[in-house]
């Protein structure tokens, strides 16, 4: 069996107003090469952007990889490493028997993660971590660029 490529991925999400215009930022490092990605949406939430960032990054990988994925989102990290197992057993319901929020993105993240060996790491945001700060800049710039793209899965709280 061949050795899997080791990719370092850093992600962040941003939202102005929450809900409001939002964006995500991604920095990917592989053997000294860096790739940056970002995009914005007209109306979304911070949590949706925190989920979409790792989804886009993982879906961009062309083959199974060993991934160290670092984010400042406890919501995303806790969800994908801990909460998701219970949600799936309960038919995507929370322990309070309410539907899981952002279920479209959780399902997509779960599917994207299955293809890779991922070490999910957390870093404190706005604490001088270079790649996280760059992701924050990319995400904020995407949110501030008057995005027109629609976040199809966003549903306003009723």
From Swiss-Prot:
One of its GO terms (cellular component) is cytoplasm. Mg(2+) 1 binds at residues 12, 50, 72. GO terms for molecular function: magnesium ion binding; nucleic acid binding; RNA-DNA hybrid ribonuclease activity. InterPro entries: RNase_H, RNaseH-like_sf, RNaseH_domain, RNaseH_sf, RNaseHI. The keyword Nucleotidyltransferase does not apply. Mg(2+) 2 binds at residues 12, 136. This is Ribonuclease H. Its cofactor is Mg(2+). It comes from Shewanella sp. (strain MR-4). Monomer. Binds 1 Mg(2+) ion per subunit. May bind a second metal ion at a regulatory site, or after substrate binding. Residues 3-144 form the RNase H type-1 domain. Its EC number is 3.1.26.4. The keyword Hydrolase applies.
């Amino acid at each position: 069996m061949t050795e899997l490529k080791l990719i370092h991925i850093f992600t962040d999400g941003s939202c102005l107003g929450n809900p409001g215009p939002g964006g995500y930022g991604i920095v990917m490092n592989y053997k000294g090469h860096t790739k940056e990605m970002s995009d914005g949406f007209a109306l979304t939430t911070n949590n949706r952007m925190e989920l979409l960032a790792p989804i886009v990054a993982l879906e961009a990988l062309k083959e199974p990889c060993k991934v160290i994925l670092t984010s400042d989102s406890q919501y995303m990290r806790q969800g994908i490493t801990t909460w998701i197992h219970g949600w799936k057993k309960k038919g995507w319901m929370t322990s309070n028997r309410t539907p899981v929020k952002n279920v479209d993105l959780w399902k997509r993240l779960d599917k994207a993660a299955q293809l890779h060996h991922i070490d999910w790491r957390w870093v404190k945001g706005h604490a001088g971590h270079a790649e996280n700060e760059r992701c924050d800049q990319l995400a904020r710039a995407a949110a501030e660029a008057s995005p027109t793209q629609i976040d199809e899965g966003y549903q306003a709280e009723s």
